[in-house]
Swiss-Prot record:
PANTHER family: GLUCOSE-6-PHOSPHATE ISOMERASE. It comes from Geotalea uraniireducens (strain Rf4) (Geobacter uraniireducens). GO terms for molecular function: carbohydrate derivative binding; glucose-6-phosphate isomerase activity; monosaccharide binding. InterPro entries: G6P_Isomerase, Phosphoglucose_isomerase_CS, SIS_dom_sf, SIS_PGI_1, SIS_PGI_2. This is Glucose-6-phosphate isomerase. One of its GO terms (biological process) is glycolytic process. Pfam families: PGI. Its EC number is 5.3.1.9. Disulfide bonds: none annotated.
Amino acid sequence: MDKLHLWERYKSHLNVNPAIGLMLDISRMDFPDGFFNDIEQRMQKAFNDMAELEGGAIANQDERRMVGHYWLREPNLAPTGGLAAEIAFTLRGIKEFAAGVHDGTVTAPTGKRFMRMLVVGIGGSALGPQFVADALGSAADRLRPYFFDNTDPDGMDRVLAEIGASLRETMTIVISKSGGTKETRNGMLEAKRAYHAMGLEFAEHAVAVTGKDSELDKTAVREGWLARFPMWDWVGGRTSVTSAVGLLPAALQGIDIAALLEGARLCDEITRGRETRANPAALLALMWHHATAGRGAKDMVILPYKDRLLLFSRYLQQLIMESIGKERDLDGNIVNQGIAVYGNKGSTDQHAYVQQLREGVNNFFVTFIEVLQDREGKSMEVEAGVTSGDYLNGFFQGTRQALYENGRESLTITVDRLDARTIGALIALYERAVGYYASLVNINAYHQPGVEAGKKAAGVVLNLQGEVLSYLHRAQGMEFTAEEMAAAIGAEKEVETVFKILLHASANPGHGIAREAGETVFDWRFRSVR
């Protein structure tokens, strides 16, 4: 197709949304002429499913709960006045608490203002807040954000080393809906130890975001933490960024959360419309369906040409893959659905994996994200009449063209500028696109049985570790190979896991296990040194 024909196709397939400063171009997706007509009936069903969801239908049958993240930016949509009042009350509480921290009404025990915050959470309790913090942060942040988003001791040590003595004026926000997430519990305990090592009371620095009457909630009440904010059972972790999970850290950082919510609300309003070609979330979902044949046949590559959107692909990775990656459909059929999502940022990626995208296996489609405003204020010229931002724009357009010339499909999202309102709109756009796509392929986007299976398996490993270490410490003076150890505790079938447990325990002095080298690693012998 020559460039003039592509221009006409671009004009025909550009979705423009002035209210949120966002355009979606689907012209470089090679869907057939009859595509929209053929799938319209299924798309209308997806609109109906979404309307039922927003109306309070039990969407997550596993847990018998509603799915109501859309109510967070439009409380009047909540199915009861009580829920609407709770949402409004919580938002007001977040704003008042943040204002108190900023004006010095709420201070650190030293009497000084809090200047930093440590957010402890994992999955949706970290990825959303991290994305927003990185996308909208600046040198003028009221509280500088740090994160414990894993149960990696070295990772937590690095964060604490960076905070250093400023821990005295650091607020810690612990986020866990159930209050029982082990990674978050571990991060909280590591943080508590760090405060105590400096002679500080953790409770005087701590805030909880959790479900009512959860173990974390009870701990916060018992210890007298600074504040508690709710996580409702009808908000899933990966769609919680416009709840207290994301709004509290953002407000404390100094981000305009009213603008964030307004962008999400306006995008919800647009993407609630039933005219498919005018609905950018519906178009996204349909392009995913076209590109992947509705069964995950191709990967989704996210290429934002903006440093501030670096973490967007990680955020979308969870939102999309945890929602869409399902073994069974709603009828119980094994379908193994999913779309793999990865990405980084342009033009960095042009010096990394774009080579394969253009000339390697064609197993993907690209979503480019273009931000028209380069920076606040005027840019210098790096060449006559050319700025650094002009180069970035040129690289984006060149990559898009080069990929399409070689039969690689792409979508392009264009936003006027990157601010809180735009970020809210992008979050809402993808949340709804995920819901529509799930309806198109007949799956439940709002549960995650695979995650629970992994947690249970981890528990089995830790129980086995307890048996292994207990036996070794009782058998003073004796040495065991992994196979001998497995036989001794009656876990012969778990010998590989026993071997991995022994390797890890012997590398960490706190466990009191030493190892002696053998002819091969499988001949290594392990003993207690306590």
